[in-house]
Swiss-Prot record:
Organism encoding this protein: Conus arenatus
Annotated InterPro entries: T-conotoxin
Domain characteristics, as noted in the entry: The cysteine framework is V (CC-CC).
UniProt-recorded name of the protein: Conotoxin ArMLCL-012
GO CC annotation: extracellular region
A Pfam family assignment: Chi-conotoxin
Domain of life of the organism encoding this protein: Eukaryota
Assigned protein family: Belongs to the conotoxin T superfamily.
Amino acid sequence: MLCLPVFIILLLLASPAASNPLEKRIQSDLIRAALEDADTKNDPRLLGLVTGACCAVLKFSFCCGKK
């Protein structure tokens, strides 16, 4: 009678659904870092250089803002 509950508890502990604390901490750190990266702002100088190079070298109208 006592064997079945002990077997069930051991099965639950060994199952893949039992989370590893280290893995859980790494996942939460990665999620937090991704959210911080998503919140960064673009540097207007860098965007100006890219659009300027696109307009000067490639002469695409959508880069220069001309219609």
